[in-house]
């Protein structure tokens, strides 16, 4: 059996029907940035507030995904690409169900983020750059990962010995190095209300 033998089954409920019932558009809000920039914190705080306001929302967090779906992947460039490919496909399924998907992944490579953008319709992928200087992320170091990377205990660590390619034209920039996480969360929620309501 090959992929040519597998047939895509159309859903009985369309994306538009879900969106009409939810009273908002579906979208991927792809939070990208260095470890320690605040992606997960901002994503979860925004999701909580949006949920309380009646939005259908889910957070897909990089660490959590690596405990399950992507636990077989390491941190080589190839594994990082596969990590993002898989989560892009999962996010697409949620978009088809009328959900706002907030992802929190370092996703260091522009090409990988672009491939996720191409999975969904125009306007359904919104790149959100959580901007924060490396030195601030290292000072925060909530998981102790930068210290381990500097000591050679973690190879291929983004920002230390593996590159992070900043977004060139993100739909939104949240500067978590200059603004507290509450302000960043509020900016993200305002973006959702303006773009998806």
Swiss-Prot record:
Keywords noted in UniProt: ATP-binding, Kinase, Nucleotide-binding, Phosphoprotein, Transferase
UniProt function note: Catalyzes the synthesis of activated sulfate.
Protein name (record): Probable adenylyl-sulfate kinase
Enzyme Commission designation: 2.7.1.25
Pathway as given in its UniProt record: Sulfur metabolism; hydrogen sulfide biosynthesis; sulfite from sulfate: step 2/3
Family: Belongs to the APS kinase family.
Pfam family, one: APS_kinase
Organism domain of life: Bacteria
InterPro entries: APS_kinase, P-loop_NTPase
Annotated GO biological process: hydrogen sulfide biosynthetic process; sulfate assimilation
Catalytic residues of the enzyme: 107
Catalysis: reaction(s): adenosine 5'-phosphosulfate + ATP = 3'-phosphoadenylyl sulfate + ADP + H(+)
Broad EC category: transferase
Induction: Up-regulated by sulfur starvation and repressed by cysteine. Also induced by O-acetyl-L-serine (OAS), a direct precursor of cysteine, maybe via inactivation of a putative transcriptional repressor of the cysH operon whose activity is controlled by the intracellular levels of OAS.
Sequence positions that bind ATP: 33-40
Source organism: Bacillus subtilis (strain 168)
A GO molecular-function annotation: adenylylsulfate kinase activity
